[in-house]
């Protein structure tokens, strides 16, 4: 399997990306290189090899919560450019 310049142009259009001719050539070459590598990986005999979901046997090893002294609210808000009551006030980001 190989990727053509038209394939890259199609994917770029779907992604709303624009590439120069030089970038288009580079992308085509790099994608073909990646596909070639994947084809090589597919040639490896993995019969009898157990699937690996992680490199460690332990999962979700977490430390215990430890309660400790925190900074005072007034001190935390001391250098805040804008605040409302006991909270930092920040500009609205989501419309």
Curated annotation (Swiss-Prot):
Single GO MF descriptor: ATP binding
Entry keywords, A to Z: ATP-binding, Ligase, Nucleotide-binding, Protein biosynthesis
Matches recorded under InterPro entries: Asp/Glu-ADT_sf_sub_c, GatC
Organism: Chlorobium limicola (strain DSM 245 / NBRC 103803 / 6330)
Pfam assignment, any one: GatC
Source superkingdom: Bacteria
Function noted in UniProt: Allows the formation of correctly charged Asn-tRNA(Asn) or Gln-tRNA(Gln) through the transamidation of misacylated Asp-tRNA(Asn) or Glu-tRNA(Gln) in organisms which lack either or both of asparaginyl-tRNA or glutaminyl-tRNA synthetases. The reaction takes place in the presence of glutamine and ATP through an activated phospho-Asp-tRNA(Asn) or phospho-Glu-tRNA(Gln).
GO aspect biological process, one term: glutaminyl-tRNAGln biosynthesis via transamidation
Reactions this protein catalyses: L-glutamyl-tRNA(Gln) + L-glutamine + ATP + H2O = L-glutaminyl-tRNA(Gln) + L-glutamate + ADP + phosphate + H(+); L-aspartyl-tRNA(Asn) + L-glutamine + ATP + H2O = L-asparaginyl-tRNA(Asn) + L-glutamate + ADP + phosphate + 2 H(+)
UniProt-recorded name of the protein: Aspartyl/glutamyl-tRNA(Asn/Gln) amidotransferase subunit C
E.C. no: 6.3.5.-
Family: Belongs to the GatC family.
